[in-house]
Regions:
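Multi-pass membrane glycosyltransferase architecture that uses lipid-linked
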Residues: 2-212, 237-361
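Extracytosolic (periplasmic/ER-lumenal) interhelical loops and adjacent juxtamembrane/interface segments
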Residues: 49-50, 221-231
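Intrinsically disordered, low-complexity regulatory segments in eukaryotic proteins
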Residues: 216-218
């Protein structure tokens, strides 16, 4: 893999985010759908406080960022622009953190360029939802964890959880890598304490907070899950969610038993297991694993199929009468995406090509 100056990576990432900003820009007649814009019309345009005056299905920090953007912006365009600036700043932090991890691991920065700046998912989904911000906090937490700056890592881990809850499945695996029970307890207290305190305060202020924010997702149906082929009817989706939980537990157990020596690969495997087992796999979630693929220093062939399928999901979504139905084009692409991600996971699990096989001299 060729060597790349970090300034090129930053420039390319900024260009991709600018393109993402433009294709979702709400004033354009042919703009591609973005969750950010939809939030505006759900009550943020009236400056309503999330969790208190407005039900919002994302964790507290996500709601605060959306609210702050709505206050700073007087209309949908300025709101969208402020939100995009927040995402762009977070994404540049993600790029910098990933570059530092690559340098520490002696991995060519060409991987960071490809995965973080040139991937179609970055163009389509960076200015879309909270996932880029979540990934930034999570990877920063991982970076400081590997630097043994445990307190800072735990704080960033808690921040990631306040944006999206998913990273909590990583906590036991991170704790096992700490040398003493004192460190493990400290990491758990900081990670869960900040997260718990914020959520407890909101629950006290609004007893419906937990139901409206977290249990909301438990009632959501199957969306882009590969196992829709086994549960095509909505009447079977409760069973599908049990199947999803079984897959998650089985996959995490396999990761634990495997005992990855390389922490970056382990985190990738855990997130890949979650994405493949969850009954909701929205396309922007792929942003979580791109920095990890870059830091692993490998170019899996299925990656190209993964990106193609992931891009086509949103491009075909509004071209289909019922995009969540089995047999629709988005669900065919979701199935292909799952197959590609599973192949990448197998490569990582069995060490095909070995992690970081291409190192810089």
């Amino acid at each position: 893999m060729m060597q790349v100056d970090r300034r090129i990576i930053y420039s390319a990432a900024l260009c991709s985010m600018l393109f993402s900003y433009l294709i979702h820009y709400p004033r354009f007649s042919n703009a591609i759908y973005s969750d950010i814009v939809s939030f505006w019309y759900r009550g943020f345009n009236k400056a309503r406080l999330p969790y208190l005056d407005l039900a919002f299905e994302y964790p507290p920090l996500a709601g605060f960022l959306a609210y702050a953007s709505s206050i700073a912006g007087r209309d949908v365009s300025s709101y969208y622009t402020v939100f995009s600036i927040i995402i762009a700043a977070s994404y540049l932090l993600l790029v910098e953190t990933t570059i530092r991890i690559c340098e520490d691991r002696r991995v060519s920065l060409g991987y960071a360029l490809i995965f973080l700046a040139l991937s179609p998912s970055v163009i389509l989904y960076s200015i879309y939802n909270f996932d880029a911000i979540f990934a930034s906090a999570l990877i920063a937490s991982l970076y400081f964890f590997m630097k043994r700056r445990i307190k800072l890592s735990a704080i960033l881990f808690s921040i990631a959880g306040l944006i999206k809850l998913v990273n909590l499945i990583l906590l036991p695996f991170l704790a096992l890598r700490l040398e003493s029970w004192r460190e493990r307890l400290l990491y758990a207290i900081l990670s869960l304490g900040i997260f718990g305190a914020v959520n407890l305060a909101l629950w006290i202020l609004n007893p419906s907070f937990i139901d409206e924010t977290y249990l909301y997702h438990a009632r959501w149906g199957l969306e882009n899950a590969w196992f829709l082929i086994f549960f095509p009817s909505e009447s079977s989706w409760d069973l599908a969610k049990l199947f999803s939980l079984f897959l998650l537990c089985y996959g995490l157990l396999k990761v634990y038993v495997r005992g990855f020596e390389d922490q970056v690969t382990e985190v990738f495997a855990i997130l890949a297991v979650f994405l493949l087992s969850n009954y909701v796999f929205t396309p922007q979630m792929v942003l979580w694993i791109l920095p990890l693929l870059a830091a692993m220093g490998r170019m899996p062939i299925p990656y190209f199929g993964l990106e193609l399928a992931n891009s086509m999901i949103i491009l075909m979504w509004f071209e289909s009468p019922n995009p969540v139905e089995l047999g629709s084009l988005p669900q065919y692409f979701a199935l292909l995406r799952a197959l590609m991600l599973f192949m990448i996971l197998l490569e990582a699990y069995f060490g095909f090509g070995r992690v970081g096989s291409e190192r810089k001299d």
